UniProtKB/Swiss-Prot annotation:
SUPFAM superfamilies: Cell division protein MinE topological specificity domain
Domain of life: Bacteria
Keywords: Cell cycle, Cell division
Protein name (Swiss-Prot/TrEMBL): Cell division topological specificity factor
Similarity remark: Belongs to the MinE family.
Amino acid sequence: MFSWLKGRRSKDTLKDRLELVLAYDRAQIPPGKVDALRNDLLEVVKRYFPAGSSNVEVEQRGDQVVLMASIALDEGIENPGRRER
């Protein structure tokens, strides 16, 4: 009945988005640069491993801006060494 109460509150979502925008601004990252980086990282990882989706985040930690990448590797990796092209 009140399923909208179970989800994330819009003020929390807005706060997270604002923090992300501020971190990008402080790091002087132009729009679209993180998306391009995400695509490039995923392309490189796929050369060596079967990989799925990726997530790249920028955070402000004190005086530093931190870039974090999380890339899901597909199951069934037989040989983690370099694949032949």
